[in-house]
Amino acid sequence: MTVPPVLAAQPPTLTELLTRHATRLGLQSTAVPGLHLYRAVAASEPVHTVYTPSVCLVAQGRKLVQQGEASLAYGPEDLLLVSVSLPLTARILEASPDRPHLALHVDLDPALIAALAVEFPETAPGAGSQAGLVVTALEPLVQGAVLRLVRLLDTPQHIPALAPLILRELGYLLLVGPEGGRLRAMVQAAGQTHRIATAIERLVREYDRPLRVEQMARDVHMSVSGFHHHFKAVTALSPLRFQKRLRLQEARRLLLSREADVTGASFRVGYDSPSQFSREYRRLFGASPREDLTRWHAGGLAGTLESPQFKEPDLRR
């Protein structure tokens, strides 16, 4: 009996799909809403970036992310779950021209997660840790959903009909998985994590404005001490340090993309004193703004400025 070719062919692996579709170095968006692919051919220096709520998978290679004092490495058998927007440091650990680093991330829609949490209230596990970042084992069902999402790139005519269904399936599987409580806490209006997530999104939008912690705590119906405690539990940073990270990372993006000089960048992100800006810039990035700019362009690193998850973030939106 002859086996039809369509049945005989093995479905492509995630590595094969990303090899085919992640054709450019750095980050690239795709025709599938919320799906982004990444390719690198060399290990990288640490990159300061803002991760938004998402799941991240590595098909080939390894990556390291740092949140506060914690370092998390992940590879092909792992899943990185980001439940709130966080300023992080990330670097590629393993990559070469013969064996490139291949990865992807899928944006998580809080509205979808919230709807699923209401629709399936009995299936979510306990909340567990408040931390907004975790590396966990990649479950086969989650891997299968992500694989089918990426395979839609082979049949773009099916994306409008099938992508929303697969994204819903992925959200459900994450919600009922080992870290589902973390996602549920993100969207439960009465929960502390949701209140902190609301404050974080406000900080991301208003990073260049004066920080008034007392008012922010009142706005999310928390005491100042409780707000500080839960904010650090979620982000590993105090509200002030969180805002400084956002400001300095946006200033760095402005400098490296040549959209502003040092003084202009410092004022645009909310600093009143360029000298204070330069001191804090050196403390975070290990070099003064001018030294960093020279080093960046001399090292041919300008092309690594991509988009959310893998780049210096653009906080203008």
Give the location of each predicted region.
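A short, N-terminal "cap"/entry segment at the start of jelly-roll beta-barrel domains
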Residues: 1-31, 35-36, 44-45, 126-131, ...
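Amphipathic alpha-helical segments enriched in hydrophobic/aromatic residues interleaved with Lys/Arg
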Residues: 2-13, 113-169, 173-174, 179, ...
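N-terminal regulatory/effector-sensing and dimerization cores
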Residues: 27-124
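Residue at a beta-strand N-cap/secondary-structure junction
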Residues: 64, 71, 210, 259-260
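N-terminal positioning helix adjacent to the helix-turn-helix/winged-helix DNA-binding module
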Residues: 138-141, 166, 188-199, 235, ...
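Basic/polar phosphate-binding segments, predominantly the helix-turn-helix DNA-binding elements
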Residues: 169, 173-179, 186-188, 204, ...
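Short, amphipathic alpha-helix enriched in basic
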Residues: 198-209, 236, 250-257
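…primarily DNA-binding HTH/wHTH and HhH modules…
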Residues: 253, 257-260, 268, 272-317
